[in-house]
């Protein structure tokens, strides 16, 4: 569970429509986002020119569940650093993201784990 004071509501973001489209590509809906955030399992995360939805997993990992925006290569490094710090602050030991080819190119230092990529935060 995430601290309610730290949770940002993605549906208040100008990126909301893009987040819903991204969720739908993965078989989810806007309602799924609202329910997970409202339950304290997920939070929105604004970036320089995009938006992420982060979800805490049962095994102490923080999953970058949804991501939209422009010029991801420009802001990805800073977002990774900030999200990693946040993950540690909520007692998570790794970051996860779906291992699509594009992410594999942008995040070559992440470890493939099945269909996902993982960044160990315990080192």
Stretches with model-predicted labels:
Residues 21-42:
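Active-site rim helix/loop that mediates acceptor-substrate recognition in acyltransferases
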Residues 1-28:
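Short amphipathic alpha-helix that is part of the acyltransferase structural core
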Residues 1, 122-123:
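Short intrinsically disordered terminal tails
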Residues 43, 109-114:
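Short secondary-structure junctions
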Residues 98, 112-122:
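Conserved catalytic-core motifs of GNAT/GCN5-like acyltransferases
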Residues 2-7, 52, 110-112:
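Generic structural motif
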């Amino acid at each position: 569970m995430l601290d309610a004071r730290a949770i940002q509501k993605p549906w208040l973001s100008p990126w909301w429509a893009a987040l819903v489209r991204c969720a739908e590509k993965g078989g989810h809906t806007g309602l799924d986002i609202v329910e997970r955030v409202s339950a304290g399992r997920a939070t929105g995360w604004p970036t320089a020119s995009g938006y992420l939805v982060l979800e805490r997993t049962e095994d102490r990992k923080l999953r970058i569940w949804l991501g939209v925006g422009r010029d991801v290569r420009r802001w990805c490094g800073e977002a990774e650093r900030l999200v990693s710090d946040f993950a540690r602050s909520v007692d998570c030991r790794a970051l996860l993201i779906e291992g699509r080819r594009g992410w594999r190119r942008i995040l070559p230092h992440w470890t493939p784990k099945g269909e996902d990529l993982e960044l160990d935060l315990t080192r």
